Structures are given as structure tokens and as C-alpha cells.
């Protein structure tokens, strides 16, 4: 499985949050949701969508989009005098990258307890356990075919 770049910062990991809010703030999560629904949006278009949920300053939206671009979460393209922003990764790619970073950090520091806890959690659901077994078989098959 290919790692997604950039690495997603884990400093703000929030276990009780939903979706990408585990690693992004509330505003950044809302921006990602907007851009996943429709890419290629200007600052004003993103602002209009955000204003449906909350009052927000134009400069806040502008700064947030620029910071998310610099973090590598968004791409942007100049159209006329303004930038148009898109999510750099699909929701699936972003979520996979987030999971890789979280699990990678746990495995790097707590390999045995992390694996044990993971197996315990997966083992609670027969279907999920079957999925894991199939993934392990596929990984071994691909690994063996490279030798």
C-alpha cells in the first residue's frame, strides 16, 4: 500500500471526533468536505458554503485555504486574479493516509501492545476478521511473487 504524502500531523489527533476531524480542526474539516463535494472552488465560493453553517470572515477563509495549501492538503490554480482550490487527495486517500500515520506511530512506539489491541478489536467482528485474513494472504502473495 502506497503511503500518502504529506504526512498528516498527529499532534492534534482527537479520538472522539468524526471523520477527518480526528486530525483537522473544525474549519479545515468543513473546507475539505466542501472541496470533496466539488473541486475547483474560489475563496468566495468556499466562504459562501461555510456561511450556510456559521458566520465567518473572508480573511479567515482566505488564510485557512492558504495554510491548507501550504500543509499539502489542497492544490490551487490561478484563474484570473484569484486562486481556485481543490483537495489534493480524495477522501479515501486522505483517510488511508491518516490511518497509516496513526497506526505507524503506534507500531513504531508500541508494536506488541498495538498489534495485540488491534487483533482483539478486529476479532470482535467475524466479517472484519475475514477481511484482515484476506488482506494478509494478499500481502504475503504479493511479497512472495517479488522474490
Enumerate the predicted regions with their spans.
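Short beta-strand "wing" residues that participate in macromolecule-binding interfaces
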Residues: 76
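Short acidic, hydrophobic short linear motifs in intrinsically disordered regions
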Residues: 41-49
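Glycine-centered, phosphate/nucleic-acid-interacting loop/turn motifs that mediate DNA/RNA or nucleotide
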Residues: 72
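Short, cationic-aromatic polyanion-contact patches
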Residues: 24-27, 79-98
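Amphipathic alpha-helical dimerization/coiled-coil segments
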Residues: 97-142
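Short helix-coil junctions and helix-kink-helix linkers
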Residues: 48-56
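Short alpha-helical segments that sit at the start of domains
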Residues: 2-33
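Short, hydrophobic-biased segments on the C-terminal half of alpha helices
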Residues: 62-66
